[in-house]
Each structure stands twice: as structure tokens, then as C-alpha cells.
């Protein structure tokens, strides 16, 4: 019996001292079984116990397909419990130690990394706003019964009330097709600011914050829960002459074609002013003074005036860019023209209540104006004696036009032209000292130094080239409509100060690069203090102190996927970088870029920017989208006046149109009355390929075409194209009474004259009449119906998304 025990012990000892041959990445290592097994539940204990299948080479050694250079210090740690880096970076070694499950080594390496990283951030970290509470949803029995009535196709338009379901498209009255990409309700989609206020837009609600010197940042207002996902947001922290006094603030959000506007008091109470409809998806939402302005690339402008409480929708030429100057809204259009609207004199045409839209300038090459920037010089007065406009075109040209005091009667004159871009210009900025342009080739930036004499741009010695660099920024494959608005690269800052770009290299990252817009020089890089993914960002100046001599400070606000908002002091960062002259770094270095791309696979494509997709080994819930700068012009052709972005898209859209390819349907807009659905989620497509008799004829400004491409998990709506690049016309006659449609359009459409008005009361005179445009039919608040009167009270006709329900026959989502 004793001999048996001795034999068993000897066998056990021999087993623990067994020599193990390893082949790690082609390099052979010899060690003992005891060395590999002393850490429980590690890779080696599982391997040698048979829980993991082994692969042996020709010599019988266990093959492990890992880096041998990183394995050497790990094996040395298993032998001696001491760490010798042997030239391997701590980050790489920690990654390998995590793979092998060497827990004691991982803890040591994490502690080393914590020496340089703090949960309180760096010297630039300014503050942290925790995630707010999500407002409760109100679902009533009345709403549920309303759902049943709508599903029975028995309700009238405008009676919808919210039940919290996703919008749906009706097929043949029996089945439905769900639309929309699910969005994390905790993620900050957009951050916007004005003066000492910021607003954070989440998926279904918005939160306003205010800063005071004594108390810091405080949450002031939280909107009600919305059934629709927010895509645009605007904030006005200084409302003069508003309905509730000068201390009111206004915040607006947009989802698809609907806009909700709230009034917020200093005390934190808020009230809904109204719900408005643009009729087509909203691409931009902003304030000009007291006016709330919404624009769509399809060629619609909506304006709401805080004093008159009036909502006006105006048809214009399809819009490709915009900018504001004082009380003026300037529109760059796809026919090569620049128009302006005077918001201070809104509305001017009392005979039909149309906005006064005047053509300011027409591009000599008839190229679409894809980027626009207006600079009001200090010499500009009420008489409008000097103004400068820089714009970029679809062919890559950058032009500067100026209004001289001597040329008031003849309109602006072409001052300079630069043809340095081979891709469409997507952004442009004319400031006091620099001209900055960005094109679609991986956000390629060209900058010039602007020479001025007495505040006015000068030709002696003229604008001189300054820098050329790129702001590489990849986007998600199936991103929400708010992504382009919440992740705009800039440039940010006042035009008489240094401006900055914010570079977010990959969509799933916790790091941003802040760079000078003039030279591309890196000012700083910021990393989330809690290591969460940055989902949105913006740069604003806030007046933290009211003391005499204090200056506003510039802050970078970052929204995160966990709902928090983090703040960074860019004023300090710029002061620090100005003191050090030895830092010449710009964007991420090659090593930094490769590190950022560790979690991504770049797919091959013919695009100017490679598509980005998640590595199969680290696949996340969020899919990645091709870069916004991914479509390059094949050959430069004139963009005809009739063409629209929703039709041919021969080049990459401006940032204003970045979401046009994945926009939702154009609802019931009379010029876009159907969708050509290629596939469905909830029901199979019949053999004939038609979804039902709801398909109708689609019209666009370029002629008849299918709806612009829509990307969603369940449906795709794409614009038909012929093999030669032209439009493929999709026509159906089912479910449509053509004579009735024609007569309705004839009643609603009438010609609009564009009065020859000067910019700034005589500064600019329009040269031509605008092509035939139609004003949207409307009625006045008073209830008198006439084709030329103002639109009715928006709260009477347009239901709020808070009460909007999933309907299968309503105008908002009907086919």
C-alpha cells in the first residue's frame, strides 16, 4: 500500500516536471509544465489540461500563433515572477498578457498605464456633466385606441397621437414595413451652444444647461419625451422681443420634416411654442436673430418669427449650401446661383406673403455652389458698402466675390479664383486672416493668407498659399441622421480669431485631435476621462465671468455614448501651444493612426476614402459607414440646373447634404409622392416585385426619378440610374388619379417674382430673375383661406411627435 502511494507521487512529480515544447509564431521555446500551470484558469492551464485543442508542428511542439517577441517577457515572468520588457511596449505586452490570461502581469501593466492616465483628466479638462434622467413616456388608453383606428384606415390627417412605436410605412393596408435605425436612448447625438447655454440632444429628448460663475454648469430644462428620434437641434440664448420677454431662451429640435419649438425661462420652466412642418426632411436648423430657420436640400426654406408668431414655407431652387450674415440668409444652389433672404423684413411681399428671395450672384461655370462663407468686414455699415463672400463649387473651384462701394448698382464682382481642388469643395471659411477650403478627398484642406488694407481684402500682395493637409474622418455605415450634425469637423471659432478643426478619426473612439484650421498644427489631443466613446462634439465660447476685463473662454464640449458631457478648455490649450515652438505635429501620426484603426477593417473600394468596417474579431453593435468624403468626381461636368442631389449625385454632397443619401422618405410632399421599396422586413415581396397599389409617380426638380437612397436595416429606397449615368424613370399609375393631381398642383402653384433688392438696403442688386418657383399653399392664423396668405397655426394642423403614433394611412408616412 505504501509502495503504491510512493509510485503515484513519483508519477505526479514527473508529470509536473515534464518539459513542454512550444512553437510561438515560428520561434521555439522550451519550458516546464509547472512553469506554465502555476496560474489557474490561464490559457496554458486550459491548453495542457485538454480543454483547448492543440495544434502541433512537425517536431511535435505545440504551435501558438502569437508574437514570439511579446511572448518572451511573458514566459520570463512565468519563470521568475519578474518583468523584463525587453523592448516591448507596455500596451502590446498587456494585450498579449490578457490573451494568455496572466492576471498578475495584467494588473501590474494596468497600474503602469494608470500613472499617465487619470479619471480627473488632464490640465485641459474643465468639467463633467453626468447623464440626465430619461423623461417618462406617456401612453394612454386613448392613444392605444387611436392606434387601432388608424390601423383601420379610418382617421383623418392631424389626429395622430403618440404611442411610442416606430414610424411605419403602409404597404397594401394589411402589412407594414418598419423604418428607422434603433438608436441608443442614452447616447448624446448632438451638442450645440449659444452664449452661456448648451443643449444636448439625445434620441428622444433634449436637455439645456447654463453656466454661472458662482454655481458653474446647471441643468435648466428637459424636454418631454418624443416618439421620434431627434436629428437636428438649435438654440437661441438671447431672444430679443420674444413673446415672454427678452429673457426667454428658445430651443428647437427636428425629426424628419417636423420641428418642435420650446420657450425656456431662466428659472427652468419651459413651454411648447408650436410644432411646424417643412414638408420634406430638414437638413439644417438654426436661428437668425429671433427667426427659426429650417432648410432642406430639396429646395424648401421654413422660417418662424418670434415676434409675429408666423411660420412660412418657401420653395426655392434645390439647396446645396448656406451661410448667414447678420439678418441675411444666403443660399448656394445647384444651378450655380447664390440667393439671399432678408429675415429682418420678413415677410416683404404682402401681395402673396412670399419671402423676398433675390439672386445675388451666378457662378460663371454654372457649377453647383457646394460651400458658402460670408465675411462682414468692419467697414460694413447699415448701407452695406462692403461685403466678401467665398464659395466652393462641385468642380473644386474656390472663388471670392466682393461688393465694392463703387459697384452698388452692379452687384458683387469676382475677386479671386483658385482651382487647387480636384474634388468638390465641401466646406469653406473666409475669416479676417485666412481663407480655408475643404474638399471631398479625405477632407483635404487648403489654406491661404488673406491680405487686408483698412479691414478690406486687398490684391497687394494678394492671397498667398499657406498650408495643405487632411482632416481624415471616417463615418459609420448605417449612421443615424444626426451623425453629420453632431460630428461636424468645423472650422470652429470667431472669424477675427484663430479657428480650429476637430478631428475624430474613427467613429468608435474616445480620442479627438484639435488642430489649427490655418496650418493644421495640432493644438492638443483629448481623451475621455471615463474612456467612453465620444458620440458628438462642438466648440463654443462662454462668458464665465461678468467682471470687467474678463474675456470669453473657448471650450470643447464632447457628448458620450453613456449620456455624459465632458468639457475641455481650448483657451488654455491654445495659450500653451503658442508658447512652445518645437511641436510641429498635426493630425495623428502613422503610428497613432494605425493604433486608432486597430478595431477596424478597411474594405477595398474605388472611393476617394476607403470604406471602414469593424474587424470580425471585434465586431460591435454599431456598424461603420463609408466616409462622408467617399465619392469623387469621375470627370468634371456641368451640373445642370435641373439636376438634384436626390437624383443623380454625380459628386459628393456638401456637409449640408451628407444625410440626403440615407434620408427618410419625403413624406407627402407633393413633388415626391411615392417610394420604390426594394425589400421589406415584415412581409415578403410579391412575385411581381410591387409592394402594392400605393406606388405612385415620383417627380423631382431634374425630372422624374426614384426617391433618393435610404439606408436602414429593413428597407432601401434608391434612385434609379441608367447605365450611362442618367435617370431611370419609374412610373406606375396604380392608386393615382392623374387629372386630380394635375388640377391640385395648378391651383397651388403660381409664379413668384424676385424683386431686385440691394443687399443691406442697397448694397447688392440681383441681376436676374430666379427660375420659376412655387410658394407653398398656406392659410393665415386667423382662418381666412387664400392661396397667398400665411400658413395656419402650426399647432392646429401638425401634431406633436410627443403624441404622434404609428399610423399606416396618415399623410406623414403613407405611400
Swiss-Prot record:
The modification Phosphoserine is found at residues 605, 665, 712, 793. Its main location: membrane. Pfam families: BTB_2. Residues 18-87 form the BTB domain. Residues 707-759 have a biased composition (Basic and acidic residues). CDD domains: BTB_POZ_SHKBP1. It comes from the Eukaryota. SMART domains: BTB, WD40. Residues 707-815 are annotated as: Disordered. One of its GO terms (cellular component) is plasma membrane. Accessory subunit of potassium/sodium hyperpolarization-activated cyclic nucleotide-gated channel 3 (HCN3) up-regulating its cell-surface expression and current density without affecting its voltage dependence and kinetics. Belongs to the KCTD3 family. Interacts with HCN3. This is BTB/POZ domain-containing protein KCTD3. It comes from Mus musculus (Mouse). The lineage of its organism: Eukaryota, Metazoa, Chordata, Craniata, Vertebrata. The gene is Kctd3.
Amino acid at each position: 500500500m505504501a509502495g503504491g502511494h510512493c509510485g503515484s507521487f513519483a508519477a505526479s512529480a514527473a508529470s509536473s516536471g515534464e518539459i513542454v515544447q512550444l512553437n510561438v509564431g515560428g520561434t521555439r521555446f522550451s519550458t516546464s509544465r509547472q512553469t506554465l500551470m502555476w496560474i489557474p484558469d490561464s490559457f496554458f492551464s486550459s491548453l495542457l489540461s485538454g480543454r483547448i485543442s492543440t495544434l502541433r508542428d512537425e517536431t511535435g511542439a505545440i504551435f501558438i500563433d502569437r508574437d514570439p517577441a511579446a511572448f518572451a517577457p511573458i514566459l520570463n515572468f512565468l519563470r521568475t515572477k519578474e518583468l523584463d520588457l525587453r523592448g516591448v511596449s507596455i500596451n502590446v505586452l498587456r494585450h498579449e498578457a490578457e490573451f494568455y490570461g496572466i492576471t498578475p502581469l495584467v494588473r501590474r501593466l494596468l497600474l503602469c498605464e494608470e500613472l499617465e492616465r487619470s479619471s480627473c483628466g488632464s490640465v485641459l479638462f474643465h468639467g463633467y456633466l453626468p447623464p440626465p434622467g430619461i423623461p417618462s413616456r406617456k401612453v394612454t388608453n386613448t392613444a392605444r385606441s387611436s392606434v387601432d383606428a388608424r390601423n383601420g384606415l379610418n382617421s383623418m390627417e392631424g389626429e395622430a397621437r403618440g404611442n411610442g412605436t416606430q414610424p411605419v410605412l403602409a404597404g397594401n393596408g394589411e402589412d407594414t414595413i418598419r423604418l428607422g435605425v434603433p438608436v441608443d436612448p442614452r447616447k448624446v447625438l448632438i451638442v450645440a451652444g449659444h452664449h452661456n447655454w448648451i443643449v444636448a440632444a439625445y434620441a428622444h429628448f433634449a436637455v439645456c444647461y447654463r453656466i454661472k460663475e458662482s454655481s458653474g454648469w446647471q441643468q435648466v430644462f428637459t424636454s418631454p419625451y418624443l416618439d421620434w428620434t431627434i436629428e437636428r437641434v438649435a438654440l437661441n440664448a438671447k431672444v430679443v422681443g420674444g413673446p415672454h420677454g427678452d429673457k426667454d431662451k428658445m430651443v428647437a429640435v427636428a425629426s424628419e420634416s417636423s420641428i418642435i419649438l420650446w420657450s425656456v425661462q431662466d428659472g427652468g420652466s419651459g413651454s411648447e411654442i408650436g410644432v411646424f412642418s417643412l414638408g420634406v426632411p430638414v437638413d439644417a436648423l438654426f436661428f437668425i436673430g429671433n427667426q427659426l430657420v429650417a432648410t432642406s436640400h430639396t429646395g424648401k426654406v421654413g422660417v418662424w418669427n418670434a415676434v409675429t408668431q408666423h411660420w412660412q414655407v418657401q420653395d426655392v431652387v434645390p439647396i446645396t449650401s448656406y451661410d448667414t450674415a447678420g439678418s441675411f440668409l444666403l443660399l448656394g444652389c445647384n444651378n450655380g446661383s447664390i440667393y439671399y433672404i432678408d429675415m429682418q423684413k420678413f415677410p416683404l411681399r404682402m401681395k402673396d406673403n412670399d419671402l423676398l428671395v433675390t439672386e445675388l450672384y451666378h457662378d460663371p461655370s454654372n457649377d453647383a455652389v457646394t460651400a458658402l462663407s460670408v465675411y462682414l468686414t468692419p467697414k460694413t455699415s447699415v448701407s452695406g458698402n462692403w461685403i466678401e463672400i467665398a464659395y466652393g463649387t462641385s468642380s473644386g473651384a474656390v472663388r471670392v466675390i466682393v461688393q465694392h462701394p463703387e459697384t452698388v448698382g452692379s452687384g458683387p464682382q469676382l475677386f479671386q479664383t483658385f482651382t487647387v481642388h480636384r474634388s468638390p469643395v465641401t466646406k469653406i471659411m473666409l475669416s479676417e486672416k485666412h481663407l480655408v477650403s475643404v474638399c471631398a478627398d479625405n477632407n483635404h484642406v487648403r489654406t491661404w493668407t488673406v491680405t487686408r488694407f483698412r479691414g478690406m481684402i486687398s490684391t497687394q500682395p494678394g492671397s498667398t498659399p499657406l498650408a495643405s493637409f487632411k482632416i481624415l474622418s471616417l463615418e459609420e455605415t448605417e449612421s443615424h441622421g444626426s451623425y453629420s450634425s453632431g460630428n461636424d469637423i468645423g472650422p470652429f471659432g470667431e472669424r477675427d480669431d484663430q479657428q480650429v478643426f476637430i478631428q475624430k478619426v474613427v467613429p468608435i473612439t474616445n480620442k479627438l485631435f484639435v488642430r489649427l484650421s490655418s496650418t493644421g498644427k495640432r493644438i492638443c489631443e483629448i481623451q475621455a476621462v471615463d474612456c467612453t466613446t465620444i458620440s458628438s462634439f462642438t466648440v463654443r465660447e462662454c462668458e464665465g465671468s461678468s467682471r470687467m476685463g474678463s474675456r470669453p473662454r473657448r471650450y470643447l464640449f464632447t457628448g458620450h455614448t453613456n449620456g455624459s458631457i465632458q468639457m475641455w478648455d481650448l483657451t488654455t490649450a491654445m495659450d500653451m501651444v503658442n508658447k512652445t515652438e518645437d511641436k510641429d505635429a498635426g493630425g495623428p501620426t502613422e503610428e497613432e493612426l494605425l493604433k486608432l484603426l486597430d478595431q477596424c477593417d478597411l474594405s477595398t473600394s474605388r472611393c476617394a476614402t476607403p470604406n471602414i468596417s469593424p474587424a470580425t474579431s471585434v465586431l460591435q453593435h454599431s456598424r461603420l459607414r463609408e466616409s462622408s468624403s467617399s465619392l469623387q468626381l469621375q470627370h468634371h461636368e456641368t451640373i445642370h440646373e435641373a439636376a438634384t442631389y436626390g437624383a443623380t449625385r454625380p459628386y459628393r454632397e456638401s456637409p449640408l447634404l451628407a444625410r440626403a443619401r440615407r434620408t427618410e422618405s419625403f413624406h407627402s410632399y407633393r413633388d415626391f409622392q411615392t417610394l420604390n421599396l426594394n425589400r421589406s422586413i415584415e412581409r415578403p415581396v410579391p412575385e411581381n416585385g410591387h409592394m402594392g397599389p400605393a406606388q405612385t409617380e415620383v417627380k423631382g426638380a431634374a425630372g422624374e426619378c426614384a426617391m433618393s437612397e435610404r439606408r436602414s436595416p429593413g428597407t432601401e429606397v434608391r434612385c434609379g440610374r441608367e447605365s450611362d449615368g442618367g435617370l431611370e424613370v419609374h412610373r406606375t399609375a396604380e392608386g393615382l388619379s392623374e387629372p386630380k393631381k394635375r388640377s391640385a398642383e395648378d391651383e397651388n402653384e403660381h409664379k413668384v417674382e424676385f424683386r431686385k433688392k440691394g443687399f443691406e438696403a442697397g448694397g447688392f442688386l440681383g441681376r436676374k430673375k430666379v427660375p420659376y418657383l412655387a410658394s407653398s399653399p398656406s392659410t393665415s392664423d386667423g382662418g381666412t383661406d387664400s392661396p397667398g396668405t400665411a400658413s395656419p397655426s402650426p399647432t392646429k394642423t401638425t401634431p406633436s411627435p410627443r403624441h404622434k403614433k404609428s399610423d399606416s394611412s396618415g399623410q406623414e408616412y403613407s405611400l
